[in-house]
Swiss-Prot record:
Family the UniProt entry places it in: Belongs to the adenoviridae hexon protein family.
PTM-bearing positions, type Phosphotyrosine: Y925
Protein name: Hexon protein
Site (Involved in interaction with pre-protein VI) residue list: G762
Organism annotation: Human adenovirus B serotype 7 (HAdV-7)
Subcellular location: Virion; Host nucleus
Gene coding for it: L3
A Pfam family it matches: Adeno_hexon_C
Length: 937
């Protein structure tokens, strides 16, 4: 050990090694400093030792990790409990901050998992194009019933001849020149056809193809899949063959040949086409029918016109930082960290603590949350800003886009050659009789690619995520009654004209119905997509994950020598543990999770024995107790807001408000908030983001006012604010006095309060917070003001309130109120009214704002804008020793579903951990002014 000193040997705890100047020669140090401006040596001469610079003993001391295997495990329906014995030997210190749970198990993401948009099968096929199919038509009366088989499709493979043996595709290279016929088990192959567009020789070729028999139910080609049944790729099922000699029943491919001749042939028939008809295992793994002409699934002429749509993407993965996997703040499901000598549990759960949210905000303060860290599954939930707020600046489509026939010409007529003769013309025998020549411009079709891309983006990303009340079930389609299932959500469609390219054109505006829809439940949630893809792209996953401890009293503890019991519970409720893009009920939709092993990995401080014993001696002293603050340090309370309610009164009984820091609040949907007090919440039928736990708040814009009244006579927070004391007006719909700010309906007063609370900026000039303060969850980064003009329905005399079914725009070029085939005729649009140009109609301006992720904050301190009237002692009345009751009233926008007011009282949430003797650990929890903790001593 180095020279003894009365000072604690903190020097031995250097983890990064010595400073370079301590061990490099003076000349090299001088050179590095002199050349630093144009050539940085950086860490090229970094001391190679890791951790303590000296007094490290054995290689065992330097072991990176130790694995602890559970001494007991309990696998229940909804939870998995593990217990470890942590034996910390003499002259060692266990670093709890280095511990993590190493979990292995099996995950079934269920049939609702779809990790991509579109379809993987025939994605280039038109949505309404059928496979080559057959159907049976029954005609006639009861006495003379006839059934005929009808076929629709294409035969693409050219052959030399057609006989009763099938399509001749070549000749054997022998003296006999035997014909080679297509192997019916896989030929003609659907992917083989004519190699060129040229076919001008006038001969009558023979063609073969494949077709699906009437017993195979029709599906659109888009999304169709049938598994192969032989190694050549053939897909036919097998059929039973009637027993022959020996009564042995055999099987053969269910394939028959059907021959066709031209309709004009009357007698001397000769086959021009042969179709190899078969039954296959037809399925649609990632698409569904969105247009169905009738109720029957049987093959028919009408069902040729079915139209497909891809299933909606639904990424499923573990939550950010494994939110929800470990039990926190749940009665009877918290963990244990107890010394075996005393059996006092250092872990005390409180219903109103915010362990998960606190951890999210802590990470945000430490680093950039947009950088993913796969080990802890750390990929923060996000959304595409272009989806939340649509900047509809139109389409750059000045030039037309054409597509042309493969030959570049189009249909041509056949001409023969002639030549002049005297005063007339005669046939030219030197020129072919069949010359295919087109006249005029070459044929082309125009498609507005930019407009289609923009319209498709709006439908896939915005329209399909509209609230269910705006959607409908397609005719002749039956969906389940449970609206939380993937099948129901996937089957509902919406009219594209609700969110079309001409809606709010030229404006930066979010669709009003979408403002209250969780934007993080979306397939463009990049964090969830990353977490889903970490697990792979299949439904069944054998996973191996590392999960950190988040509980503030345990996660950074230095555990001194002794023997300890450490146990924790892990959830198996898929709705809590997993997250999905659509937020469907994963329990109903067949997801499941099972754990096969949960081990604990831990690291000892890599110190010499004598150094560790010095550290132990220091920490055993009660003046050096370890104290930890919960990062959020707040008591949270949830107050129910009934559907369509606008006022929420809150009363807090009388107490002393010393050391109180202020309020934070936001709004949550009841559906998206689990009951943390119970081990398993049977009513939590949702798997999207959980704002209560992960910080994905999005309803801040629904607050109008908040008033705060203490039972004292003090006007709080003073009279020098723009508006009345004790009341904070958050937004104004009508703003005659000009109190609003930033082209939106937020008041200047509230903007200033947020700048003060988040950045300590109480200045009304141009002052932007420093980058290190303006984090992902902060106010300034997430504040999004917007405005638009709409028709003045009162003062524009010619205004007609034409409802959606009677509006037309792009008629003839789009489907009618449905994402189906285009219909109608080209005609002048009757919607929307022009807001620009010489014929612009009278308009009014609408303003609003969105502010996601953050929580509204109101600070409480004696220097906040002169907090009320000060006494002659310079002490605010509220800080006197007398207790005060608190009344708060929140005014909010009505919502058509029950919600919750999430209110944080910012206090000091502290734990003090004392380890006086070997194997003894004591903890005292202190919370002011909401002292709800209890000591374990």
């Amino acid at each position: 050990m180095a020279t003894p000193s009365m000072m604690p040997q903190w020097a031995y705890m250097h983890i990064a090694g010595q400073d370079a100047s301590e061990y490099l020669s003076p000349g090299l140090v001088q050179l590095a400093r002199a050349t630093d401006t144009y050539f940085s040596m950086g860490n090229k001469f970094r001391n190679p030792t890791v951790a303590p610079t000296h007094d490290v003993t054995t290689d065992r001391r330097q072991r990176l990790m130790l694995r602890f295997v559970p001494v007991d495990r309990e696998d229940h329906t909804y939870s998995y409990k593990v217990r470890y014995t942590l034996a910390v030997g003499d002259n060692r210190v266990l670093d709890m901050a280095s511990t993590f749970f190493d979990i292995r198990g099996v995950l079934d993401r269920g049939p609702s998992f779809k990790p991509y948009s579109g379809t993987a099968y025939n994605s280039l096929a038109p949505k309404g194009a059928p496979n080559t199919s057959q159907w049976i038509v029954t005609a006639g009366e009861e006495r003379a019933v006839t059934t005929t088989t009808n076929t629709f499709g294409i035969a693409s493979m050219k052959g030399d001849n057609i006989t009763k043996e099938g399509l001749e595709i070549g000749k054997d290279i022998t003296a006999d020149n035997k014909p080679i016929y297509a192997d019916k088990t896989y030929q003609p192959e659907p992917q083989v056809g004519e190699e060129s567009w040229t076919d001008t020789d006038g001969t009558n070729e023979k063609f073969g193809g494949r077709a699906l028999k009437p017993a195979t139910k029709m599906k659109p080609c888009y999304g169709s899949f049938a598994r192969p049944t032989n190694i050549k790729g053939g897909q036919a099922k097998n059929r039973k063959v009637k027993p022959t000699e020996g009564d042995v029943e055999t099987e053969e491919p269910d394939i028959d040949m059907e021959f066709f001749d031209g309709r004009e042939a009357r007698d001397a028939f000769s086959p021009e086409i042969v179709l190899y008809t078969e039954n296959v295992n037809l399925e649609t793994p990632d698409s569904h029918v969105v247009y169905k002409p009738g109720t029957s699934d049987d093959n028919s002429h009408a069902n040729l016109g079915q139209q497909a749509m891809p299933n909606r993407p639904n990424y499923i993965g573990f939550r950010d930082n494994f939110v929800g996997l470990m039990y926190y703040n749940s009665t009877g499901n918290m963990g244990v960290l107890a010394g075996q000598a005393s059996q006092l549990n250092a872990v005390v759960d409180l219903q109103d603590r915010n362990t998960e949210l606190s951890y999210q905000l802590l990470l945000d303060s430490l680093g950039d949350r947009t950088r993913y860290f796969s080990m802890w599954n750390q990929a923060v939930d996000s959304y595409d800003p272009d989806v939340r707020i649509i900047e509809n600046h139109g389409i750059e489509d000045e030039l037309p886009n054409y597509c042309f026939p493969l030959d570049g010409i189009g249909p041509a007529k056949t001409y023969q050659g002639i030549k002049s003769k005297d005063n007339g013309w005669e046939k030219d025998d030197n020129v072919s009789k069949s010359n295919e020549i087109a006249i005029g411009n070459n044929q082309a079709m125009e498609i507005n690619i930019q407009a289609n891309l923009w319209r498709s983006f709006l439908y896939s990303n915005v329209a399909l995520y509209l609230p269910d009340v705006y959607k409908y079930t397609p005719t002749n389609i039956t969906l389940p009654a449970n609206t939380n299932t993937y099948e129901y959500m996937n089957g509902r469609v919406v009219s594209p004209s609700l969110v079309d390219s001409y809606i709010n054109i030229g404006a930066r505006w979010s669709l009003d119905p979408m403002d209250n829809v969780n934007p993080f439940n979306h397939h463009r949630n990049a964090g969830l997509r990353y977490r889903s893809m970490l697990l792979g792209n299949g439904r069944y996953v054998p996973f191996h994950i590392q999960v950190p401890q988040k509980f503030f009293a345990v996660k950074n503890l230095l555990l001194l020598p002794g023997s300890y019991t450490y146990e924790w519970n892990f959830r198996k409720d898929v709705n809590m543990v997993l997250q999905s893009s659509l937020g469907n009920d994963l329990r109903t939709d067949g997801a499941s999770i099972s754990f096969t092993s949960i081990n604990l990995y831990a690291t000892f401080f890599p110190m010499a024995h004598n150094t560790a014993s010095t550290l132990e001696a220091m920490l055993r002293n009660d003046t050096n107790d370890q104290s930890f603050n919960d990062y959020l340090s707040a008591a949270n309370m949830l107050y129910p807001i009934p559907a369509n309610a606008t006022n929420i009164p809150i009363s807090i009984p009388s107490r002393n408000w010393a050391a109180f820091r202020g309020w934070s609040f936001t709004r949550l949907k009841t559906k998206e908030t689990p009951s943390l007090g119970s081990g398993f919440d049977p009513y939590f039928v949702y798997s999207g983001s959980i704002p209560y736990l992960d910080g994905t708040f999005y309803l801040n814009h629904t607050f109008k006012k908040v008033s705060i009244m203490f039972d004292s006579s003090v006007s709080w927070p003073g009279n020098d604010r723009l508006l009345s004391p004790n009341e904070f007006e958050i937004k104004r719909t009508v703003d005659g006095e000009g109190y609003n700010v930033a082209q939106c309906n937020m008041t200047k007063d509230w903007f200033l309060v947020q700048m003060l609370a988040n950045y300590n900026i109480g200045y009304q000039g141009f002052y932007i917070p420093e980058g290190y303060k303006d984090r992902m969850y902060s106010f300034f980064r997430n504040f999004q003001p917007m405005s638009r003009q709409v028709v003045d329905e009162v003062n524009y005399t010619d205004y007609k309130a034409v409802t959606l079914p009677y509006q037309h725009n792009n008629s003839g070029f789009v489907g009618y109120l449905a994402p189906t085939m285009r219909q109608g005729e080209p005609y002048p649009a009757n919607y929307p009214y022009p807001l620009i140009g010489t014929t612009a109609v009278k308009s009014v301006t609408q303003k609003k704002f969105l502010c996601d992720r953050t929580m509204w904050r109101i600070p409480f301190s004696s220097n906040f804008m002169s907090m009320g009237a000060l006494t002659d002692l310079g002490q605010n009345m509220l800080y006197a020793n007398s207790a005060h009751a608190l009344d708060m009233t929140f005014e909010v926008d009505p919502m058509d579903e029950p919600t919750l007011l999430y209110l944080l009282f910012e206090v000091f949430d502290v734990v003090r951990v004392h380890q006086p003797h070997r194997g003894v650990i004591e903890a005292v929890y202190l919370r002011t002014p909401f002292s709800a903790g209890n000591a374990t001593t």
